[in-house]
Amino acid sequence: METRTNEYSRKGAMWELERNLDQPMDAEAGRLRNMYREKTYPTILLLRLAFQSLGVVFGDLGTSPLYVFYNIFPHGIEDTEQVIGALSLIIYSLTLIPLVKYVFIVLRANDNGQGGTFALYSLLCRHAKINIIPNQHRTDQDLTTYSRRTYEEKSLAAKIQRWLEGHQFRKNLILILVLFGTCMAVGDGILTPAISVLSATGGIQVEEGRMRNDVVVIISVLILIGLFSMQHYGTDKVSWLFAPIVFVWFILIGILGAVNICKYDHSVLKAFNPVYVYRYFKRGKTSWTSLGGIMLSITGTEALFADLSYFPVQAIQIAFTVVVFPCLLLQYTGQAAFIAANTNQVSHAFYISLPAPILWPAFAVATAAAIVASQATISATYSIIKQALALGCFPRVKIIHTSKKYLGQIYSPDINWILMVFCIAVTAGFKNQSQIANAYGTAVIMVMLVTTFLMIPIMLLVWRSHWTLVVAFTVLSLLVEIPYFSAVVRKIDQGGWVPLVFAAGFMIIMYVWHYGTLKRYEFEMHSKVSMAWILGLGPSLGLVRVPGIGLVYTELASGVPHIFSHFITNLPAIHSTLVFVCVKYLPVYTVPPDERFLVKRIGPKNFHMFRCVARYGYKDIHKKDDDFEKMLFDSLILFVRLESMMEEYSDSDEYSTLMMSLPNNPGISNGGVTTTGTNNVMEVMSCTSTHDSIVPVNSRSDDTGSSQVMPASGQMAFQSVGDEIAFLNACRDAGVVHILGNTVIRARRDSGFVKKIVINYMYAFLRKICRENSAIFNVPHESMLNVGQVFYV
């Protein structure tokens, strides 16, 4: 007991005061939450959604037959058994990866209907403390969309959780893995339009044999320019065409495949016997290197998961098993039958096998399907960048809603033009399918491997699967993916280097931005203003309180930011009502509007200071018509009403009770304010103190229209909650000013060379070219105030 008393005396009463005052948002600041219920769909609606998913999810996978066999046998075919072996590999690759792994397993690992790499990462962040967002709090777990499980102490899941949380290196490793997969997915968004459009337009050469390849490239580039130039219009007006186009495409290739099987060589059906896979590999090194071409048959599989947000899992499962999978098997088998009978016509085998009367209609449908596939990939890239931005891993770029009906349809002009430039560069630079296919295969297999590795902790932590099932899934996936990976690695010098360069560039940007953002947050956290110092200034904060509301933006979810002390040090006045606004993103896909804002009072009521935390998910967007300011003010009024109804103590009562319980400790100094004892602090905090010469104003204007600052011998005390609400409304009518920090981050002089390069040049450059916070929050320029500071980290 004596030891505890000595320890308490050593730390001081002011330390205890600071510890109790500087608390994050507590559970009382939130709202009662609605229970989240998973949607159920009637059979008719589910079938309709399954049909619509064809146009969004399966376009990339469906256009693969245009270029697969040419990339398997770029140097010709030796015999028919070689074709049967390749077909057997295609059949079982389609069965094991898209059907078994993705449709029936990975799709279940969705984050309340959201898919993709960041969705998996968000699930992990909620079940283990590995997330990269530092300003999180336990109250965030009360959200209806923040679903997580608890574990028994000795369970395997609990051990895995402790292992992941046990070292910063493991957290960083998972982050790097996620960022790498994200960067490869962005590379996929560059390469898919290039190879899909180039392969589709290549059909012209079948009819016009003397047409040079350069002409095909020019036509492809023009189509790509048109595709990217139309992105800002959105797909809402034409998306209803996507599903019929892709459906017609699948029916076309399915029927054509069945006809070719009957017409040319039905012996290729032997490929369904897996023994031909073994025989194919016995042929030597050539068969192994051809795996890069075979792998193209499963490109677009990741879109099954990445585009999950648009459709329920059951709809995608129905569409794949009923339409996509059978039609692809028929087409690949029929194309193999044609090639087996015409071994010298591998190039453009799809178009050559077509009956002459339907060549041009098929060419039109193929080109339309390629454009639809490209559009789906481009849209997915926008979503990926948006998720990375929300999790603090990408510089702020402009995000625009292109549809009032579908919130998921977004457009980023900055990313759009970057994608277009790179896509055209790849198309015009390589000029042929082979090298682009090698690059494409590298990007796809990397994303698949990342998904496999992330699924391991998902199955253990989220699903609590038995370890034998986890091992079976991992072995089954790697059994297919590792051979493909080894094949594409051998072709790095033949175009496979392209996605690696793209990934390296985006990886550097993402990690530098995340590192700089984290360092800036750590500096703000360590240099935040002492709450005891703020309270020691009195209700007027030592300044003139003028009518109006000041919204001070900060990344801190608790405490008063350093920007505020910098502000009041350099200006003689401050607004009569202050709200510290923290806009933060959580590892959830969305935050319901009625749970978005948390409000808490700072200090006694007569300080008129509040903290408001606005929470968003990685799918949520600050829209211009959201009226963020109005929603924040409504939440503030609601908090005041609820506070008056609560039976518990108000914050000021809690503070007074706390101070009465503290022992006297004269000579405490904190935050530059020296007191002679706790009684003085109590006087500052008490609502009946009479030591302030300037009090919060009544913001009514006089007859001349000028606002007055009213001195008084006592502090303003509200007789009822109606008085405080009237005061807040009057402050709002007087004007709202948004106070943002315009900070410059510099590395300390004693920092290492690499850190100086990263912070002083790379991060500084990214901050210079990215969008300002004021633009992201849609803050009007006439009511914005920037406070400049230099942070040395």
From Swiss-Prot:
Q: Which residues are glycosylated?
A: N432
Q: Which GO terms describe its cellular component?
A: membrane
Q: Where in the cell is it found?
A: Membrane
Keywords, A to Z, come to:
Glycoprotein, Ion transport, Membrane, Potassium, Potassium transport, Transmembrane, Transmembrane helix, Transport
Quick one: a GO biological-process term for this protein?
Answer: potassium ion transport
Q: Which Pfam families match?
A: K_trans, K_trans_C
Q: Which domain of life is it from?
A: Eukaryota
Q: Which residues lie on this side of the membrane: Cytoplasmic?
A: 1-53, 108-172, 236-237, 309, 373-409, 464-468, 516-793
The keyword Transmembrane is annotated on this UniProt entry: yes
Q: How does it sit in the membrane?
A: Multi-pass membrane protein
Provide the membrane-side ranges marked Extracellular in the record. 75-86, 194-214, 259-287, 331-351, 431-442, 490-494
Annotated signal sequence is none
The residue ranges crossing the membrane are 54-74, 87-107, 173-193, 215-235, 238-258, 288-308, 310-330, 352-372, 410-430, 443-463, 469-489, 495-515
Q: Name one GO molecular function term.
A: potassium ion transmembrane transporter activity
Q: What does the function comment of this entry state? A: High-affinity potassium transporter.
Stated family: Belongs to the HAK/KUP transporter (TC 2.A.72.3) family.
Q: Which PANTHER family does the record cross-reference, listed alphabetically?
A: OSMOTIC STRESS POTASSIUM TRANSPORTER, POTASSIUM TRANSPORTER 18
* This protein's name: Potassium transporter 18
Query: What are the top taxonomic ranks of the organism?
Result: Eukaryota, Viridiplantae, Streptophyta, Embryophyta, Tracheophyta
